[in-house]
Amino acid sequence: MSAHIINGTEIAAAIREEIRSEVTALKAKHGIVPGLATVLVGDDPASHSYVDSKIKMCQNLGIYSEHHPLPQSATNEDLLTLIARLNADPKISGILVQVPLPVQISENLVLNAINPDKDVDGFHPVNVGRMCLGEPCFLPCTPHGVQELLIRSGIKIEGTHVVIVGRSNLVGKPLANILLQKAPGANATVTICHSGTKNLPLITSQADILVSAMGKPKFITADMVRQGAVVIDVGTTCIGYTPEGKRILSGDVDFEAVKEKAFAITPVPKGVGPMTIIMLMLNTLTAAKRAAGLVK
């Protein structure tokens, strides 16, 4: 029997409507409009595409947006000056600096300059620390999206063994911290695997929930998955192009084989991807409410 397909596009659409209603109510009751500033350095086509999608989503939800493009030759000082201005701008609830950045720019220096209260990507050390302590913070968008996918799909997390393959600062590490918390939608036993892990299939096959975030197409095969497990595929790799020039994407999981063994599985595309941008919008809304003293 084939697995239940967890449709991230549908779940993200439901959250989008919830956010739209909140944005409308926030404006009507308090005269507050959430605002997102995006900063893009250089002309990388993929980065342009990502930023464009975020701007369009803001427009769709009634969130004010500003875009600040900078040339490839921009310096640390250029970015720090811009971020200081955005930090001080009351119209801006959240600031997003699109990464990767050119080699001459210190990513840590720039991201750490963002006011933690406007760090809607959840990358600032203050937010990372709050996340680890289980305090109110902005959760990184992709890990938060994974948690929401599980919760809204009715999949129990509490008490389960979650195995995460990948230890990046963007996905693996924060997701482990999120799911470890003694809180609803968490409280799992978490194992992290990585390039130095020995006997990887032995560990992954013990998972109730298996999350792969490596960027290695079809690396997770059916023999690495326990019968009846939930499989979340965060990996997204371009493996080619259609004759029309559209990207062909592959996840980390051998989807066709694994879906015959799993209880539930996310596809690529239309799985985790749509959740990332909607979590960014949710963080921007939350930032606006916090700035107004409406939530903690």
Swiss-Prot record:
EC number: 1.5.1.5, 3.5.4.9
Taxonomic superkingdom: Bacteria
Presence of keyword Zinc-finger: no
CDD domains found in the cross-reference section: NAD_bind_m-THF_DH_Cyclohyd
GO molecular function, one term: methylenetetrahydrofolate dehydrogenase (NADP+) activity
SUPFAM superfamilies reported for this sequence: Aminoacid dehydrogenase-like, N-terminal domain, NAD(P)-binding Rossmann-fold domains
Signal peptide (residue range): none
GO biological process: one example: tetrahydrofolate interconversion
InterPro entries xref list: Aminoacid_DH-like_N_sf, NAD(P)-bd_dom_sf, THF_DH/CycHdrlase, THF_DH/CycHdrlase_cat_dom, THF_DH/CycHdrlase_CS, THF_DH/CycHdrlase_NAD-bd_dom
This protein's pathway: One-carbon metabolism; tetrahydrofolate interconversion
Presence of keyword Amino-acid biosynthesis: yes
Assembly: Homodimer.
Function of the protein: Catalyzes the oxidation of 5,10-methylenetetrahydrofolate to 5,10-methenyltetrahydrofolate and then the hydrolysis of 5,10-methenyltetrahydrofolate to 10-formyltetrahydrofolate.
Xref: HAMAP family: THF_DHG_CYH
Protein name as annotated: Bifunctional protein FolD
Protein's organism: Dehalococcoides mccartyi (strain ATCC BAA-2266 / KCTC 15142 / 195) (Dehalococcoides ethenogenes (strain 195))
Gene that specifies this protein: folD1
